[in-house]
A protein has these predicted regions:
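Contiguous, well-folded functional domains in the mature portion of proteins
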Residues: 1-216
């Protein structure tokens, strides 16, 4: 049986903790979220593999919830566990180009399948995870040394996705820009022309604002 006091401490204190994060210097891209790397996907001709239907490709714009800055690149997915810090941070320094919320295509689906596949180390971790394309999301586009797109993705039980920034605002690498309440996911699209060398792989643990996802 769960101790009510322990649950309340987790829900209203531990869950919303906000530790200091120190972004590493240099030409690198840092993680926008705490959690586990769910996938590192190559994007070709504006499409990528459907996580539910084998052999079917999905338009990148549908995945992002907005128009992609480029048709080729890399998409990194990070599953934020219930134990993760749930603040999101800017992966690079730059100007906020757009903030675009998109409602769910139906109802938000549970992310429990992704959590269990990560827990039991069963790659590909995103297999049969229909929520990736269906759930509500908030997309933040940042233009710095190159354009990037960050997607805050809501879980079935998420009550709110908070975004603290607005278009034309300047952000520093590692600066907080949002918060997703309860378990959730955060994706990052890096365009091919950025020339980023990815330094992480599926299953890796990452910290928002500190873990380097790639260098350029």
């Amino acid at each position: 049986m769960i101790d009510p006091i322990s649950f309340l401490a987790w829900r209203f204190w531990y869950f919303f903790r906000d530790p200091v994060r120190r972004p590493p210097p240099g030409r690198n891209v840092v993680s926008p979220a705490d959690g586990r790397v769910l996938y590192v996907r190559d994007v070709e001709a504006g499409t990528l593999p459907n996580p539910v239907k084998s052999g079917v490709r999905v338009p990148l714009d549908d995945w992002l919830g907005t128009v992609a800055p480029e048709s080729g690149g890399t998409l990194v997915g990070i599953y934020m566990t219930p134990a993760s810090v749930h603040y999101n941070r800017a992966p690079i320094a730059g100007r906020i180009v757009a903030v675009a919320p998109r409602p769910a295509k139906g109802e938000n689906l549970s992310m429990a399948r992704a959590f269990m596949r990560l827990l039991w180390n069963m790659p590909p971790y995103e297999e049969d995870c229909g929520y990736i394309l269906q759930n509500a999301r908030n997309t933040v586009a940042i233009d710095g040394d190159f354009p990037v797109v960050v997607i805050q993705m809501a879980d079935r039980f998420v009550s709110q996705v908070d975004c603290f920034v607005r278009p034309e605002q300047q952000v520093e690498k590692g600066e907080k820009f949002g918060l997703i309440r309860m378990g959730s996911q955060c994706d990052l699209f890096l365009p091919k022309r950025a020339g980023v060398t990815i330094t992480i792989k599926p299953g890796d643990r990452v910290l928002a604002g500190e873990t380097i996802l790639g260098t350029y």
